């Protein structure tokens, strides 16, 4: 029987994702904190936090799950044509904090943000530990787009992206796909299925199939220098 678990501030184990509610889809647990160890434990089991500023911490593992195989993002001809005209540059981990701030900025038709100050502090700590990473898009020296997420073995767990110029976030995603493929990553977790992600090539996997892939790749090895600050290039 599916039921909602309540967490305290001890670093206890998460319940199995199979116990998540079906309505709302994937809600598994409530409470706890955003301690780096708890966050890593969550992602290791296919669970992630997602909540509004005035809510308690909510933990999710939806069914189905949106995933990409690195290198399989669909780029339309119009997108490629547009990007070829740009002189943007791309970096890894050059401006993680600024990317998070960009992702947290208010958006049209959106009431508030789930990327609260507590979330920003928690993921910045994971970044300092070499576990959370960003891709940046620059127009000269102006940050115009980017994304961030966590690397768990050979799995990249995408969290959020933003843009201030058209197609900059899609460019960041293309860069991420190409980069992860070269670094030996096997899976990108895009979390919640939606039409936009599906239009870019995401697959909706049953949760149990996603968990099986996660278990297969979460302890995999990638190059130790994968996430040093560097400039990268978009291949079109």
Swiss-Prot record:
Keywords: Acyltransferase, Cytoplasm, Transferase. One of its GO terms (cellular component) is cytoplasm. It is an enzyme of class 2 (transferase). InterPro entries: Acyl_CoA_acyltransferase (IPR016181), Leu/Phe-tRNA_Trfase (IPR004616), Leu/Phe-tRNA_Trfase_C (IPR042203), Leu/Phe-tRNA_Trfase_N (IPR042221). GO terms for molecular function: leucyl-tRNA--protein transferase activity. Its EC number is 2.3.2.6. It is found in: Cytoplasm. It catalyses: N-terminal L-lysyl-[protein] + L-leucyl-tRNA(Leu) = N-terminal L-leucyl-L-lysyl-[protein] + tRNA(Leu) + H(+); N-terminal L-arginyl-[protein] + L-leucyl-tRNA(Leu) = N-terminal L-leucyl-L-arginyl-[protein] + tRNA(Leu) + H(+); L-phenylalanyl-tRNA(Phe) + an N-terminal L-alpha-aminoacyl-[protein] = an N-terminal L-phenylalanyl-L-alpha-aminoacyl-[protein] + tRNA(Phe). It comes from the Bacteria. NCBIfam families: aat. HAMAP family: Leu_Phe_trans (MF_00688). This is Leucyl/phenylalanyl-tRNA--protein transferase. It comes from Shewanella sediminis (strain HAW-EB3). The gene is aat.
């Amino acid at each position: 029987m599916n039921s909602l678990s309540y967490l305290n501030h001890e670093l206890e184990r998460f319940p199995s994702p199979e116990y998540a509610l079906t309505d709302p889809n994937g809600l598994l647990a409530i409470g706890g904190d955003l301690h780096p160890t708890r966050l890593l434990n969550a992602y290791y089991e296919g669970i992630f936090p997602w909540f509004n500023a005035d809510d308690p911490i909510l933990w999710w593992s939806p069914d189905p799950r949106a995933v990409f195989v690195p290198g399989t993002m669909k780029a339309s001809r119009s997108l490629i044509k547009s990007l070829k005209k740009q002189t943007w540059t791309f970096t890894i981990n050059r401006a993680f904090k600024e990317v998070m701030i960009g992702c947290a900025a208010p958006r049209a038709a959106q009431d508030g943000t789930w990327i609260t100050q507590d979330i920003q502090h928690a993921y910045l700590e994971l970044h300092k530990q070499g576990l959370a990473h960003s891709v940046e898009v620059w127009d000269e020296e102006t940050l115009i787009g980017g994304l961030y997420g966590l690397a768990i073995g050979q799995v990249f767990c995408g969290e959020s992206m933003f843009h201030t110029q058209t197609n900059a976030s899609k460019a960041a995603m293309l860069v991420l796909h190409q980069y992860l493929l070269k670094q030996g990553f096997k899976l990108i977790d895009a979390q919640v299925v939606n039409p936009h992600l599906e239009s870019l090539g995401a697959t909706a996997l049953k949760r149990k199939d996603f968990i099986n892939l996660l278990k297969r790749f979460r302890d995999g090895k990638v190059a130790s220098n994968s996430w040093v600050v560097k400039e990268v290039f978009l291949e079109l």
